[in-house]
Amino acid sequence: MPPVPIYVKGGVWTNVEDQILKAAVQKYGTHQWSKVASLLQKKTARQSELRWNEYLNPKLNFTEFSKEEDAQLLDLARELPNQWRTIADMMARPAQVCVERYNRLLESEDSGGAALSTGVTDLKAGDINPNAETQMARPDNGDLEDEEKEMLAEARARLLNTQGKKATRKIRERMLEESKRIAELQKRRELKQAGINVAIKKPKKKYGTDIDYNEDIVYEQAPMPGIYDTSTEDRQIKKKFEQFERKVNRKGLDGNKDKPSKKNKDKKRKHDENEHVEKAALGESTTLTDEYKKPKLILSAPGTKQGKVTYKKKLESKRQKLIEAQATGTVLTPKELLPHDSGQEDNERSNIKSGKQLKSRIRKFLVQMFASLPSPKNDFEIVLSEDEKEEDAEIAEYEKEFENERAMNEEDNFIEPPSQNDAPRVSLVAVPLAYSTLPIPEFKNNPQSAIDNKYNLLVANAINKEPHMVPEDTVDFLKEVESRMQHITQGRTSMKIQFKTAMPPTEVLLESIQSKVESIEQLQRKLQHVQPLEQQNNEMCSTLCHHSLPALIEGQRKYYADYYAYRQEIRSLEGRRKRLQAMLNSSSSI
């Protein structure tokens, strides 16, 4: 029998052990170190935990200490002596690194800047070191040893196994139950074919509240009874359900109703052949009568083609509607002056002209709306590109062209008034528009003048359906203007203005001015008496706000605190009195 190897757990960590430890921590976490150590043959649970917390944890900081961190380390070592775990957590560094850095700082101060001790990184792999968990891992030497291969294979098998023994047993039991159920169904089917009807055995219930999904309806809630009697309908439904079950048990679920029998097929085929032979003997053609039915003869209406209006008729009707719409004219144009018979060229020319005018109006309206927008509130300058500058120039040119075109249109559209002898009598009644009321425009968001304010006032009155009332002073002023205009005589000579009201004499004016001056001086003297009162009032307010109110609040707070202490003392004295009374009563009873 070969000797059993004895492992002394500990020593330098290898690269394979570090990788196994990382994978085990990912699966088992940082609280089940006994399970983690079971994957490592030469390491204990304590050593695995120290290795993770001192070297492998990705949260640890292994960079060089800065001056601020050195100062913080010295302060913490002075405040928390020999509590290196706590200091390491606060510094986010391993405890051994903090100890070595602290010793190095002390030795450098004692020796004048030369460090004498060796740190963790100064030791070589393989040297005897009690703090092997803080050392670097030993690199792999080519091929792995047999022990390392065995340890790695076992760790891989255990870490890759996501199902434990209990889960595997549950899966095996579930598969066994499924196979039993399938065998039971097969046996019942064979017995039923042999004429023996065997009912399905109900499974045993572990609890009294278990649900049989083959018999019961899961979580069924019976509907509440209504106001009408439905017992007759229930009996009919139950009877139909029983008939359906008997039919299914006898013929199956689908039945044979959808399958045409062979006898019916043969009878139908023979009947068709006999009918065809009889018609052929009589000389009748079965092509039109048997294959399809002739459609009913429907003649189209006159002026249409196959029951539909022709394309030319549609086009002509639309053209007449357009001509009638264009010949209506404006609202104030008399009917006698409207053109009744015009040629196709005049209509096309007027259509083109009206389309251009409509486009120009829309474009001008858009330009005006963009111009009425408020100026931007940004502070930076907006530099226009060359394309935008060209567009602005085109808009300016377009506005000029539009003004010229409008002037020319006004000259062309001017209609000379007919003579009194030849002109017919024109009705001055305006043709009403298509709608009874005009649409109400929107408010101007940023009114910049009195006209804009007046416009917004008119819009508000229109929305509220209130008449726009002229102020009384304006009405009086207009009446006065009209009365004066009646007395003005127009002539070629210069106009003479006569003042109806005479100016008062100079003495009266001086007396009124003197009286006003005296009243002003009297008011100033009264104000001199008010100024000391104002100053006194300000002083009293400052004293009240800065001294009296804070003192009152402080006294109130102190009173509440003293009163609370007083109440606590009273409660304690009352409890002490009750205890003494109870003691006296007990002693007297004894």
UniProtKB/Swiss-Prot annotation:
<keyword id="KW-0507">mRNA processing</keyword>
<dbReference type="GO" id="GO:0071006">
    <property type="term" value="C:U2-type catalytic step 1 spliceosome"/>
</dbReference>
<keyword id="KW-0238">DNA-binding</keyword>
<feature type="compositionally biased region" description="Basic and acidic residues">
    <location>
        <begin position="244"/>
        <end position="263"/>
    </location>
</feature>
<keyword id="KW-0539">Nucleus</keyword>
<dbReference type="InterPro" id="IPR021786">
    <property type="entry name" value="Cdc5p/Cef1_C"/>
</dbReference>
<dbReference type="InterPro" id="IPR017930">
    <property type="entry name" value="Myb_dom"/>
</dbReference>
<dbReference type="GO" id="GO:0000350">
    <property type="term" value="P:generation of catalytic spliceosome for second transesterification step"/>
</dbReference>
<comment type="similarity">
    <text>Belongs to the CEF1 family.</text>
</comment>
<dbReference type="Pfam" id="PF11831">
    <property type="entry name" value="Myb_Cef"/>
</dbReference>
<keyword id="KW-0508">mRNA splicing</keyword>
<dbReference type="GO" id="GO:0005737">
    <property type="term" value="C:cytoplasm"/>
</dbReference>
<feature type="compositionally biased region" description="Basic and acidic residues">
    <location>
        <begin position="337"/>
        <end position="351"/>
    </location>
</feature>
<dbReference type="InterPro" id="IPR047242">
    <property type="entry name" value="CDC5L/Cef1"/>
</dbReference>
<keyword id="KW-0963">Cytoplasm</keyword>
<feature type="DNA-binding region" description="H-T-H motif">
    <location>
        <begin position="33"/>
        <end position="56"/>
    </location>
</feature>
<feature type="domain" description="HTH myb-type 2">
    <location>
        <begin position="63"/>
        <end position="110"/>
    </location>
</feature>
<feature type="region of interest" description="Disordered">
    <location>
        <begin position="336"/>
        <end position="355"/>
    </location>
</feature>
<dbReference type="GO" id="GO:0005681">
    <property type="term" value="C:spliceosomal complex"/>
</dbReference>
<comment type="function">
    <text>Involved in pre-mRNA splicing and cell cycle control. Required for the binding of the NTC complex (or PRP19-associated complex) components to the spliceosome to mediate conformational rearrangement or to stabilize the structure of the spliceosome after U4 snRNA dissociation, which leads to spliceosome maturation. Its absence leads to an arrest of the cell cycle, possibly due to the inefficient splicing of TUB1.</text>
</comment>
<keyword id="KW-0747">Spliceosome</keyword>
<protein>
    <recommendedName>
        <fullName>Pre-mRNA-splicing factor CEF1</fullName>
    </recommendedName>
</protein>
<dbReference type="GO" id="GO:0003677">
    <property type="term" value="F:DNA binding"/>
</dbReference>
<dbReference type="Pfam" id="PF00249">
    <property type="entry name" value="Myb_DNA-binding"/>
</dbReference>
<feature type="region of interest" description="Interaction with PRP19 and self-interaction">
    <location>
        <begin position="460"/>
        <end position="490"/>
    </location>
</feature>
<dbReference type="InterPro" id="IPR009057">
    <property type="entry name" value="Homeodomain-like_sf"/>
</dbReference>
<feature type="domain" description="HTH myb-type 1">
    <location>
        <begin position="1"/>
        <end position="60"/>
    </location>
</feature>
<feature type="compositionally biased region" description="Basic and acidic residues">
    <location>
        <begin position="271"/>
        <end position="281"/>
    </location>
</feature>
<dbReference type="InterPro" id="IPR047240">
    <property type="entry name" value="SANT_CDC5L_II"/>
</dbReference>
<comment type="subunit">
    <text>Belongs to the NTC complex (or PRP19-associated complex), composed of at least CEF1, CLF1, ISY1, NTC20, SNT309, SYF1, SYF2, and PRP19.</text>
</comment>
<feature type="region of interest" description="Disordered">
    <location>
        <begin position="244"/>
        <end position="286"/>
    </location>
</feature>
<keyword id="KW-0677">Repeat</keyword>
<dbReference type="GO" id="GO:0000974">
    <property type="term" value="C:Prp19 complex"/>
</dbReference>
<feature type="DNA-binding region" description="H-T-H motif">
    <location>
        <begin position="84"/>
        <end position="106"/>
    </location>
</feature>
<dbReference type="InterPro" id="IPR001005">
    <property type="entry name" value="SANT/Myb"/>
</dbReference>
<dbReference type="GO" id="GO:0000398">
    <property type="term" value="P:mRNA splicing, via spliceosome"/>
</dbReference>
